[in-house]
């Protein structure tokens, strides 16, 4: 795990979320010393912000698609 001040934009939402979950587990269980925990917390904030950015981008893309779509679009539930 690198602890840079910024995240590369090419890290996927899923990768960032997975790493964030690992950080939370480590901090919650007290597996890290104070300095490492603070660095992990800082990394966690970066990951959280990255995930929020990715979610916002996805939401805006969906809204744009919805606005461009014909108003007769019908959403149907499908079974998996």
UniProtKB/Swiss-Prot annotation:
Pfam name, any one: Exonuc_VII_S
InterPro entries: Exonuc_VII_S, Exonuc_VII_ssu_sf
EC class of the enzyme, as a word: hydrolase
Entry keyword Metal-binding: no
GO biological process, one term: DNA catabolic process
Alphabetically ordered keywords of this record: Cytoplasm, Exonuclease, Hydrolase, Nuclease
Catalytic activity field: Exonucleolytic cleavage in either 5'- to 3'- or 3'- to 5'-direction to yield nucleoside 5'-phosphates
EC numbers for this chain: 3.1.11.6
Localisation: Cytoplasm
GO molecular function, one term: exodeoxyribonuclease VII activity
GO cellular component labels: cytosol; exodeoxyribonuclease VII complex
Primary location: cytoplasm
Domain of life: Bacteria
TM region(s), chain numbering: none
Family, as annotated: Belongs to the XseB family.
Role description: Bidirectionally degrades single-stranded DNA into large acid-insoluble oligonucleotides, which are then degraded further into small acid-soluble oligonucleotides.
Assembly mode: Heterooligomer composed of large and small subunits.
Protein name listed in UniProt: Exodeoxyribonuclease 7 small subunit
